[in-house]
């Protein structure tokens, strides 16, 4: 089992860092490669993450050829010919995002069986919106134990209103609708950049998707899709993590290839806090002096609100800012577990249901801490950089799901950090 050791206290990040393709984009893109019955699909700018290997295995388990060239960061998928309709439990159970294969398999084969997914232990994250939407399109859904079975000889276009703008449900229904007969409208759809990226891939495959990035999606079904090429969009959450890292260490960092528009909610709060953020030709520059920063109140919301996937990292920043900051988490319950670990480092915080009060400005102390989920692992490492003494972060399987060589990128910016293997 690996662990990360951080020697904190004097870290001031300087330089530039390159951002990978988005983890939250590439997983549904891989699910979409199930749809084309003709030709091959090439995905480029693919991040090398454990979740990507897991999703590759999910798709491969459908008797689809998947070749991952890690050196080129490319995945070539050939789904032409007959494919299986049962997603392999051993891989689906490892990752929440794997539920997005349900819609593509059903649309392609008329029948699909997928086990209840696994992944980070952040709240209940129910999949009822996925299932209600597919039922509206004519699917018969049955749940037996931990398995979900969906059947529909031919999906039919439908008007779907989602009670909540779920990213996963929007992706699942959008993909299923591409091969349905007639027109599907999804109201209150998720608007994240990863939704737009998926729609762009589907349209390159021959789909007719309109409205991606707005509250209303319209999909006109077609008879078949074909393979294509697509470059995965940059990871706004990785970019945001390094922006926060620069701010909390009084650093000066150019986050290369970061997209301003995708990070606008985070940038707005950084600037409100007093961080200097500027758009440059090849990325976003972040400069800060933590002594001059002021506390803020942040509420997580679906896009274009403040992203829940940046909540943990931002609370680490709040910890170094003098005064009382407030973080309100409205998207997922049970997403303040990292604060319990940061209490071991001396953080003073009170948590009441969906709200955390952060009493910042007091020096953190290095301590052994344990990652509780993907973004918490990054937050604890960032906290370790500004803490006095040594911080040891364990349970790195979470980190590897969403960050590629995180410790090496931080070290290149000046952090005193290393990753070691325990016997």
Curated annotation (Swiss-Prot):
InterPro entries assigned: Enolpyruvate_Tfrase_dom, Enolpyruvate_Tfrase_sf, MurA_subfamily, RNA3'P_cycl/enolpyr_Trfase_a/b, UDP_GlcNAc_COvinyl_MurA
Keywords: Cell cycle, Cell division, Cell shape, Cell wall biogenesis/degradation, Cytoplasm, Peptidoglycan synthesis, Pyruvate, Transferase
Listed EC numbers: 2.5.1.7
Cell compartment(s), UniProt: Cytoplasm
Catalytic activity from the UniProt record: phosphoenolpyruvate + UDP-N-acetyl-alpha-D-glucosamine = UDP-N-acetyl-3-O-(1-carboxyvinyl)-alpha-D-glucosamine + phosphate
Major site of localization recorded for this protein: cytoplasm
Modification type 2-(S-cysteinyl)pyruvic acid O-phosphothioketal: residues: 120
Class of enzymatic activity (EC top level): transferase
Active site: 120 (proton donor)
CDD domains in UniProt: UdpNAET
Binding site for phosphoenolpyruvate: 23-24
Keyword Transmembrane helix: no
GO cellular component: cytoplasm
GO molecular function, one term: UDP-N-acetylglucosamine 1-carboxyvinyltransferase activity
Binding site for UDP-N-acetyl-alpha-D-glucosamine: 96, 125-129, 309, 331
Coiled-coil zones: none
Matching NCBIfam families: murA, PRK09369.1
Name of the protein in question: UDP-N-acetylglucosamine 1-carboxyvinyltransferase 2
Organism phylogeny: Bacteria, Bacillati, Bacillota, Bacilli, Lactobacillales
